[in-house]
């Protein structure tokens, strides 16, 4: 890369940065501005989501009352921006409203102390009390009752959906949840007139639930990235991913989008859902206006209404690679001026490297690309301090080979196992693996993570070879972030804390490198942990699996050094026991009689 070109890139990058950072014209009333930009429907939906994410235990009706009060106030300010209190910040207005809840102290305890603080400390305090694992009942489809409620009052029905999802997922991407609510509405509009409401609705709602869980996990990873590793880490992640998606866009264009996208997600992660949704709409507009220079895959997205358009752009497939991309070595391993470029503008030079490398490798995961960039940076730090830097960094690309081979080998090994045993037994293998790595972690968390990791096999192992690695490692990043978030709430393992906090890019290799925790004192064998009753027979299949997998994790905690064959024997005996007693005429009597025998045989098998 010639130096004049690099200077131009630096100038463009800086311009793009400042275009993204400078806010639009200031308004007398922020709340009036957002109300006018978003419209009443989306404004109310986003305020409901924001309040539900902060106060996760409050009844729906209480939130509706707060939302209506805020909306009426916004209308007043939209009519007259100079009216009383209309010049207050959104944090001040929303925080004041949350602090009027009469049951705040009784329901939330320490969260009520936040109300004694001033902004911005008050909002930061509210954020720290968001609960990623709230104690809320499972939501089960009830097609007849739900259709009756939908037909009676569609707006209330959809509001209840926003509320229920938001309070279970306190970092859900606000504007994206509005999109999913539209999907939810479409499912009920289609299925409620059907003769077989359940047959029509349940598969659709199950599929929507999977999309919701995936969307929630993606945004939680973004928010964790900000919280634990800062804005620079999020920008690096975004440069890598967007360069893969938009390989025809130049670096300045990718940089501008990354800067704006960073602002959008920072706002949503910070609870600023109105600003986030408004800025996302602006970014969507910009991308569609400049689609010719960004990606040939955007046209179908840009013809859609706003919520669908933004969702479509976020999920758009990678564009075709330009056919004339030169080899990277000339600019990043052979150029004698590399150290000068690097020292003059480190972040821009490294960003350019990450962009160029990522756009050529849609077959790599984002975290692998970040590990490569990190290795490149470390090499330049070392070589640029030596007597002959060009000779030192000339072979830097050779250092990337083991970084690439390690995850490729891991994906092949795991996909081979998945194809051999199927999803359920693959989950079991992962539950055993992770229980041995971190036996101190709670059994429900280990089972949840093992099941999620196991589903990655179903999602990724059937894909073409070129897509397996990015699919697997990108989804593993989501599952491991969930483990880190839950572990942070109740930390029990220094090894897990280290993997979670050292480096976002190195998380997966760190977890893969964990072995049997030799310092762990095995859990005492308790018969009641392995005692079951007839109610297991009527459970849905997934809940039945969770019961069995919980027993498996407990067995490993009791006997961490149990062999694969020992565990297979015990699990096989357990499955046979459940099948036998669920088929018996007197199920409870069978469980009472056969259960102690199972416990005894399990202890013997593990001895």
From Swiss-Prot:
Keywords: Calcium, Cleavage on pair of basic residues, Copper, Disulfide bond, Lipid-binding, Metal-binding, Methylation, Phosphoprotein, Repeat, Secreted, Signal, Zinc. InterPro entries: ALB/AFP/VDB, Serum_albumin-like, Serum_albumin/AFP/Afamin, Serum_albumin_CS, Serum_albumin_N. GO terms for molecular function: DNA binding; enterobactin binding; fatty acid binding; metal ion binding; pyridoxal phosphate binding; toxic substance binding. GO terms for biological process: cellular response to calcium ion starvation; cellular response to starvation; negative regulation of mitochondrial depolarization. GO terms for cellular component: blood microparticle; cytoplasm; protein-containing complex. The modification Phosphoserine is found at residues 29, 82, 89, 442, 512. Ca(2+) 2 binds at residues 37, 278, 282. Residues 19-24 form a propeptide. Coiled coil: none annotated. Cu cation binds at residue 27. It comes from the Eukaryota. Ca(2+) 1 binds at residues 30, 267, 272, 275. Disulfide bonds join 77-86, 99-115, 114-125, 147-192, 191-200, 223-269, 268-276, 288-302, 301-312, 339-384, 383-392, 415-461, 460-471, 484-500, 499-510, 537-582, 581-590. Zn(2+) binds at residues 91, 270, 272. The modification Phosphothreonine is found at residues 107, 443, 445, 569. Interacts with FCGRT; this interaction regulates ALB homeostasis. Interacts with TASOR. In plasma, occurs in a covalently-linked complex with chromophore-bound alpha-1-microglobulin; this interaction does not prevent fatty acid binding to ALB. Belongs to the ALB/AFP/VDB family. PANTHER family: ALBUMIN, SERUM ALBUMIN-RELATED. Binds water, Ca(2+), Na(+), K(+), fatty acids, hormones, bilirubin and drugs. Its main function is the regulation of the colloidal osmotic pressure of blood. Major zinc transporter in plasma, typically binds about 80% of all plasma zinc. Major calcium and magnesium transporter in plasma, binds approximately 45% of circulating calcium and magnesium in plasma. Potentially has more than two calcium-binding sites and might additionally bind calcium in a non-specific manner. This is Albumin.
């Amino acid at each position: 890369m010639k130096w004049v070109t690099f200077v131009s890139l630096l100038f463009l990058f800086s311009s793009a940065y400042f275009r993204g950072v400078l806010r639009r014209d200031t308004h007398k009333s922020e709340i009036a501005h957002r109300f006018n930009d978003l419209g009443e429907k989306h404004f109310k939906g986003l305020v409901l989501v924001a309040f539900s994410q902060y106060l996760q235990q409050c009844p729906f009706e209480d939130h509706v009352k707060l939302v209506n009060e805020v909306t009426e106030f916004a209308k007043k300010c939209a009519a007259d921006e100079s009216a009383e209190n209309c010049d207050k910040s959104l944090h001040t207005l929303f925080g004041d409203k949350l602090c009027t809840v009469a049951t705040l102290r009784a329901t939330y305890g320490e969260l009520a102390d936040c109300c004694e603080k001033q902004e911005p400390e008050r909002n930061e305090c509210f954020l720290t009390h968001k609960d990623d694992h709230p104690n809320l009942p499972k939501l089960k489809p009830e097609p007849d009752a739900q259709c009756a409620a939908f037909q009676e009052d569609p707006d209330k029905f959809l509001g209840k959906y926003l509320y229920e999802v938001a309070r279970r997922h306190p970092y859900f991407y606000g504007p994206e949840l509005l999109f999913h609510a539209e999907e939810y509405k479409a499912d009920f509009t289609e299925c409620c007139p059907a003769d077989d409401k359940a047959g029509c609705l349940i598969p659709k709602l199950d599929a929507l639930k999977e999309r919701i869980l995936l969307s929630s996990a993606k945004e939680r990873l973004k928010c964790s990235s900000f919280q634990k590793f800062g804005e620079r880490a999020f920008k690096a992640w975004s440069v890598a991913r967007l360069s893969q998606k938009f390989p025809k866009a130049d670096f300045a264009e990718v940089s501008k989008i990354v800067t704006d996208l960073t602002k959008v997600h920072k706002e949503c992660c910070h609870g600023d859902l109105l600003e986030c949704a408004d800025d996302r709409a602006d970014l969507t507009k910009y991308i569609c206006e400049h689609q010719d220079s960004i990606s040939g895959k955007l046209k179908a997205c840009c013809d859609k209404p706003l919520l669908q358009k933004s969702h479509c752009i976020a999920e758009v497939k990678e564009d075709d690679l330009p056919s004339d991309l030169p080899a990277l070595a000339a600019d990043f391993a052979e150029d004698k001026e590399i150290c000068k470029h690097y020292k003059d503008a480190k972040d821009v030079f490294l960003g350019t490297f990450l962009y160029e490398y990522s756009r050529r490798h849609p077959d790599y995961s984002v975290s692998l690309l970040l590990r490569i960039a990190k290795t490149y940076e470390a090499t330049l730090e070392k070589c640029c301090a030596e007597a002959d830097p060009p000779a030192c960094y000339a072979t830097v690309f050779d250092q990337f080979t083991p970084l690439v081979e390690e995850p490729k080998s891991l994906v092949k090994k795991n996909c081979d196992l998945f194809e051999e045993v199927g999803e359920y037994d693959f989950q079991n293998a992962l539950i055993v693996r992770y229980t041995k790595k971190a036996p101190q972690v709670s059994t429900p968390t280990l089972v949840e993570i093992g099941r999620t990791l196991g589903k990655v096999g179903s999602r990724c192992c059937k894909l073409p070879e070129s897509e397996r690695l990015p699919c697997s490692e990108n989804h593993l990043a989501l599952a491991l972030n969930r483990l880190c978030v839950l572990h942070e709430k109740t930390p029990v393992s220094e090894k897990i804390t280290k993997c979670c906090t050292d480096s976002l890019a190195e998380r997966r290799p760190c977890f893969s490198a964990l072995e049997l925790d030799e310092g762990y004192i095995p859990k005492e064998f308790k018969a009641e942990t392995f005692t079951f009753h007839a109610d297991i027979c009527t459970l849905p299949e997934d809940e039945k699996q969770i019961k069995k997998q919980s027993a498996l994790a407990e067995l490993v905690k009791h006997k961490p050094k149990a062999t694969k064959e020992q565990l297979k024997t015990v699990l096989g005996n357990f499955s046979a026991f459940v099948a036998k007693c669920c088929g018996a005429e007197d199920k409870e009597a069978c469980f009472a009689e056969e259960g102690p025998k199972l416990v005894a045989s399990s202890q013997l098998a593990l001895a």
